[in-house]
Amino acid sequence: MGSRGSFVDIDKGDFTFVEGGQTFRKVAMVDDVVVLERFEGGVKAPDYSHSADRIYAVIQTQKAKNKKTGEYETVTRLKQLAFYDKNHDQKISVDFGHPHTGVRPHIHIDRIHDKNVPGIPPTKEQLELANKIIRRLKLDAY
């Protein structure tokens, strides 16, 4: 799976990958959702999808402190759901990793990440899809 901006020329419809630009790995499918894993760095869904009208779920395995025991443990969590349009462009992303103006999870529209815009909670359908992915893949809660 290509990284952000790793396609040859999206303006000309060339969605082949740039050499060395693959930073996501497809790990599963849940219904029509492609589940990708990012192994290092920040977790943001790709700006563009390889397929039109696609939904990606991005997960990441990392060390996290257990709130009850204080010990660090390995957890795998859903970090983002990303929805793409017919032009392969990301239209909505649901961010589970951190709060935005106090709202967690929250959505971003058209890849706009403006700290001055109030956080928008995900829809009921988006949360149901996230919870289905978490259940099916036995992920840790977000």
Predicted features along the sequence, with ranges:
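Non-Sec secretion/translocation targeting segments of pathogen effectors
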Residues: 1-4
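Catalytic toxin/effector domains delivered as secreted proteins or via bacterial secretion systems
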Residues: 7-142
